[in-house]
UniProtKB/Swiss-Prot annotation:
Biased composition (Low complexity): 10-27, 66-75
Species for this entry: Streptomyces antibioticus
Name under which the protein is recorded: GTP pyrophosphokinase
Positions of region (Disordered): 1-82, 669-691
EC number of the protein: 2.7.6.5
GN (gene name): relA
Domain TGS, residue spans: 499-560
Keyword field: Antibiotic biosynthesis, ATP-binding, GTP-binding, Kinase, Nucleotide-binding, Transferase
Residues that span the membrane, as ranges: none
Length: 841
């Protein structure tokens, strides 16, 4: 297996099924993270019609099994049992001929439990028949029959090793909501357990996840889970298949569902210990929300995989050799790397991709807990452990009952190696989580079936069964006993960028706040006026300072002032955590300190103009400011100045709009040369560098390339006569063309006529995963392409994405394509494109 993530394979029926009379399933293949589809669907991506179907037909019994000619009568004992078993399997195969599309699913079911009863398989087939009949005529967004979706979901459940009741519920999970097949009918046909599961999934589908999830929403999920955790397993399989087949939805809906998957379903799979599902959900959602970063990480992984695999093979061989010498039976494999986890480490830990991906991880699986610690000692005897990196999750399991030994050692060539050591049973739980309970039972039967029947088998002790259920019971008890859903909500992480705390009002209402919130945040969450007038607080009956940090379960009461002039303090902005409180405080000062903001706005405009050497008195006229204020949808000049002073509008943006209203910088200041800057920064009216443009019908005219759109040869252009009697050349699609067209008499026809001395301005934007020496590498590549960099601006966002903008001179615009290609080859760069320095939105 390659060292990359290997996802569950989706239900992909045999090709023969597509030609069968019954509708064939066309579920997408999950594959590895490179292969799976990046597009993605809603939870119910179907255009459903609701015809009234006939009642479902009962499956026909298998034909009687006739004894072949010459066949001796069955003898009693083991021989007769084997004959009956063969005939039973033959009957199942014959029965399956009615629905060949079911064969891939039933093949997995029989592999999980070779001794499964024929009647149980018939019940699964019956569930398919009922679902197919009630969904007949309904279509998914892809145009496929809707039955392909529940069939694919059920195949995922079968791969998880779920029991027959869960498989039947998977086939029927949409029947109650989308058809007239009622709960009473379902219970009559398939029993109370299947009815309970389908009803639970239907109720869970109605839970709406808002931006700030309420405690009641979380309680609904816990209640649904407490009744039977298989409800959530079905829901996760449902979401996984929808994520695999989301490309048929509109982009906006894809992103909405992908974000919901990252914030709700992937953390939920993590809470249930179902890491196999969690990893694939994260990678699929990551590919939809951040496609460029996803593609770049995929490319970087593919680039480094050969060397990493070579080093991994060396480490694996040495570990296996040492364990073999100690007579410890073990399986040693490379640990998968998942694209979203790589991305998260880049963001959260601020580490370079090379540092993350080159850290090799291996997994050691053994038979017993004693062997786990023996293997740990063996590894530490060969390589020195890194202090502080050992974790014993066997003695102290995680919240989802994850158990393993974690250690990091200094491996060959001085490189760190991460190891996870656990038993096979622990690994099963780590991969499948809550689903491992059912998978464990199925695999135990499968192993038993391979033992010779004439050899006595040890009886499974009563305590073994109780211990097997203890993990499931402990997880459910933990959920039931958590009256305050804060801890559960923290695990779901409705906002991945922060944790939350839950506090109570004096009336016992629950208020959700960011971690580290204060009584001031609480006050603004209750009401804006309560926040503005807050003067003190009491937490759990004790007076506390307003900057005190609140914890889960705190009972908070605030005191307010009735004075007419009561208001917030600017100091509060230094410790409040919630966006609501911060925005409300700023809004108050925006209203109450209007004069101060207006003065700050005026000063900001003046500073921006002085920085560009622009004539302030000429530009800042009353008419121009009033016109601009109205264009920006402010009632007057004071309002626009206040907006600038408060930081709502950039001063540079306002100055640029004022200059453009006067016809550009060349019109605003005739003394400032607006031609493309030469290396000597000449201020002469005629630069030595020819702009390479001629005006039709006019000779000896001063021609300049407009900086607002920086046209280059080959692009459609127009000329505009400025107030300085020069001709400013713009691209035909320039953002300023609309305003220029208001004076058609000043527009001239121009055309390109570049000469050897022509030089053009080009601005490009580079987007990359942030790392050390990134700027150095990009500028080196630009220098190698023989372009003259005039300016560079770099900023890094909180998600560790570096955005760089470079402005440079070049003589041949055809060379731009080579420049962009060279920059795109820099490690970590996932997008580079030309930009125009037009007005900022």
């Amino acid at each position: 297996m390659p060292d990359e993530a290997q996802h569950l394979t989706a239900a992909k029926p045999d090709s023969a099924a597509g030609a069968a009379a019954e509708p064939a399933a066309h579920a997408q293949d999950g594959g590895g993270p490179v292969e799976h589809d990046r597009s993605a669907p809603a939870d119910k991506p179907a255009e459903r019609t609701r015809p009234k179907p006939a009642p479902p037909e009962r499956p026909r019994p298998p034909p009687p099994r006739a004894r072949a000619a010459g066949q001796p009568a069955a003898r009693s004992g083991g021989s007769s049992n084997r004959v009956r078993a063969r005939l039973a399997r033959l009957g199942v195969q014959r029965a399956n001929l009615t629905h060949p599309v079911l064969e891939p699913l039933l093949r997995i079911v029989r592999a999980n439990d070779p001794k499964i009863e024929t009647s149980t398989l018939r019940q699964i087939e019956k569930a398919y028949q009922v679902a197919e009949r009630w969904h007949r005529g309904q279509k998914r967004k892809s145009g496929d029959p809707y039955i392909t979706h529940p069939l694919a979901v059920t195949t995922i459940l079968a791969e998880l090793g779920m029991d027959p009741a869960t498989l039947m519920a998977g086939l029927l999970h949409d029947s109650r909501e989308d058809t007239e097949y009622g709960l009473d009918d379902l219970r009559r046909d398939f029993g109370d357990v299947v009815g309970l599961l389908v009803d639970g999934v239907t109720k869970l589908d109605k839970v709406k996840f808002g931006e700030a999830a309420q405690a009641e929403t979380v309680r609904k999920m816990v209640v649904a889970m407490a009744k039977d955790p298989r409800v959530l397993v079905i829901k996760l399989a449902d979401r996984l298949h929808n994520m695999r087949t989301m490309r048929y939805l509109k982009r906006e809906k894809q992103e909405k569902k992908a974000r919901e998957t990252l914030e709700i379903y992937a953390p939920l799979a993590h809470r249930l210990g179902m890491n196999t599902i969690k990893w694939e959900l994260e990678d699929l959602a990551f590919a939809i929300l951040y496609p460029k970063m996803y593609d770049e990480i995929v490319r970087l992984v593919a680039e480094r995989a050969p060397k990493r695999d070579e080093y991994l093979a060396i480490v694996t061989d040495e570990v296996q050799s040492d364990l073999r010498a100690r007579r410890i039976k073990a399986t040693v494999t490379g640990r998968p790397k998942h694209y979203y986890s790589v991305y998260q480490k880049i963001i959260v830990r601020g580490r370079d991709f090379a540092e993350i991906y080159d850290l090799v991880g291996i997994r050691v699986l053994v038979d017993t807990v004693r062997d786990c610690y023996a293997a740990l000692g063996t590894v530490h005897a060969r390589w020195n452990p890194v202090p502080g990196r050992f974790k014993d999750y066997i003695a102290m399991p995680k919240f989802n009952m994850y158990q393993s030994l974690h250690t990091t050692v200094i491996g060959p060539n001085g490189k760190p190696v991460e190891l996870q050591i656990r038993t096979f049973d622990m690994h099963r739980r780590a991969e499948y989580g809550i689903a491992a309970h059912w998978k464990y039972k199925q695999e135990a039967v499968a192993r038993a079936s391979k033992v010779r029947t004439d050899v006595p088998k040890p009886a499974k002790g009563k305590d073994d069964h109780l211990n097997d259920m203890a993990w499931l019971r402990q997880l459910l008890d933990w959920q039931k006993e958590t009256e305050d859903p804060g801890e559960f909500l923290e695990s779901l992480r409705f906002d991945l960028s922060r944790n939350e705390v839950f506090v109570f009002t004096p009336k016992s209402d629950v208020i959700a706040l960011p971690a580290g919130a204060t009584p001031v945040d609480f006050a603004y969450a209750v009401h804006t006026e309560v926040g503005h007038r807050t003067i003190g607080a009491r937490v759990n009956g004790r007076l506390v300072p307003l900057e005190s940090t609140l914890d889960n379960g705190d009972l908070v009461e605030v005191f307010t002032s009735k004075a007419a002039g009561a208001g917030p303090s600017r100091d509060w902005l230094g410790f409040v955590k919630s966006p609501r409180a911060r925005n409300k405080i700023r809004a108050w000062f925006s209203k109450e300190r209007r004069d101060e903001a207006i003065e700050q706005g005026k000063d900001a405009i003046a500073r921006a103009m002085r920085k560009q050497n622009l004539p302030i008195q000429r530009i800042l006229t009353g008419d121009s400011l009033v016109t601009l204020a109205h264009e920006m949808r402010y009632p007057d000049i004071s309002s626009s100045d206040a907006a600038i002073g408060e930081g709502h509008v950039g001063a540079q943006n306002v100055v640029q709009k004022l200059v453009q209203a006067l016809g550009g910088e060349e019109a605003a200041s005739e003394e400032i040369d607006e031609a493309v800057p030469s290396r000597s920064r000449s201020r002469k009216r005629r630069s030595n560098q020819d702009p390479g443009v001629v005006v039709k019908g006019v000779d000896d005219v001063w021609v300049k390339l407009a900086r607002c759109c920086t046209p280059v040869p080959g692009e459609p252009i127009i000329g505009f006569v400025t107030r300085g009697s020069a001709v400013s050349v713009h691209r035909s699609d320039c953002v300023n063309v609309e305003s220029l067209a208001r004076e058609p008499e000043r527009i001239l026809e121009v055309e390109w006529a570049p000469t050897q001395s022509s030089v053009f301005l080009v601005a490009i934007q580079v987007e990359a995963l942030d790392r050390s020496r990134l700027l150095s590498d990009v500028t080196r590549v630009l220098s190698d392409q023989h372009v003259n960099i005039l300016s560079a601006a770099v900023q890094t966002s909180r998600d560790r994405v570096a955005t760089s903008r470079f402005t440079f001179e070049m003589g041949d615009p055809k060379h731009l394509g080579h420049v962009l290609k060279a920059v795109r080859g820099v490690e970590g760069v996932y997008d580079v494109y030309r930009v125009t320095p037009g007005p900022q939105p």
